[in-house]
């Protein structure tokens, strides 16, 4: 009888422990989800605020902030400094693992991708920009095929084409320009260039991780550092460094908005790394799809972007396909299978681009 009591006590203890572990897991997941949603929703709102809403001068007149390169510089400096602080706190070495020219190649494509993203907002609205970035799966797959020799299955290409179709429905059936511009074709070209450069960034970074034993913070420091140098060089070359600083100093709110933009991007990177480490890229991908959908809804409410019914259908087609892809990838993972589809998920998942947080 005594032994029976001991067994019951043991099973009760195990049950309580399992409940505590599950509660801890759920709390961590909730914090990770809240961190990603909060940081990147704030980032999206501030990004649109900086690029498409005018700022007031001291005399009451209004001007637009036009220096996308300066925003890239601000974000990269903040991210590099944050990574340096973390590395020093962990007692790790700041020495570069890969040759410097490897980081420069990633930084250059990363800079071009981010610059194109900011510039595009001058010509197309935020929902268009966000949905356009969801359509980068096909370019990433093509770049991965030609650069890394990856192979993808018919299902991978079907998913990519469905997402691309949803994007085209969105682009062709309603207004996609911002309130101040009618030159949407230039904005679409910039978004295409963004996807091209971002695809190269993801592929180059993946090759670096495979070729060298390095931490994500090593890439953060040196890629962001190189990107900062590139940004300063371009600002000096086109004579925009000091005018950008002057604009920030003479217009209320620009400094605060740009600082918060950089802080939310840096925080977003940290939460991304934590989420992938604790829960995996598939959970992160699902969170990011939800975040992108919510950001479009918020943008339409805050900045009054009119979307047609067919545009909403196109958006739902894109996000529905992305959710389906996450479920399929999860089944493959738990089934112990790995093929081209998981590679597609890896290269198109925002988390794998550790420096381009502008998702």
From Swiss-Prot:
Intracellular or extracellular location(s): Golgi apparatus membrane
The reaction(s) this protein catalyses: 3'-phosphoadenylyl sulfate(in) + adenosine 3',5'-bisphosphate(out) = 3'-phosphoadenylyl sulfate(out) + adenosine 3',5'-bisphosphate(in)
Spans annotated as Disordered: 332-359
Alphabetized UniProt keyword annotations: Antiport, Golgi apparatus, Membrane, Transmembrane, Transmembrane helix, Transport
BP-aspect Gene Ontology terms: 3'-phosphoadenosine 5'-phosphosulfate transport; transmembrane transport
Compositionally biased region (Low complexity): 340-359
A GO MF term: antiporter activity
Keyword Iron-sulfur among record annotations: no
Record's bilayer topology term: Multi-pass membrane protein
Transmembrane stretches, start-end: 26-46, 68-88, 157-177, 184-204, 228-248, 254-276, 300-320
CC terms in the record's Gene Ontology section: endoplasmic reticulum membrane; Golgi membrane
InterPro entries: SCL35B1-4/HUT1 (IPR013657)
Function: Probably functions as a 3'-phosphoadenylyl sulfate:adenosine 3',5'-bisphosphate antiporter at the Golgi membranes. Mediates the transport from the cytosol into the lumen of the Golgi of 3'-phosphoadenylyl sulfate/adenosine 3'-phospho 5'-phosphosulfate (PAPS), a universal sulfuryl donor for sulfation events that take place in that compartment.
UniProt similarity note: Belongs to the nucleotide-sugar transporter family. SLC35B subfamily.
Protein name: Adenosine 3'-phospho 5'-phosphosulfate transporter 1
Species in which this protein is naturally found: Dictyostelium discoideum (Social amoeba)
Taxonomy of the source species: Eukaryota, Amoebozoa, Evosea, Eumycetozoa, Dictyostelia
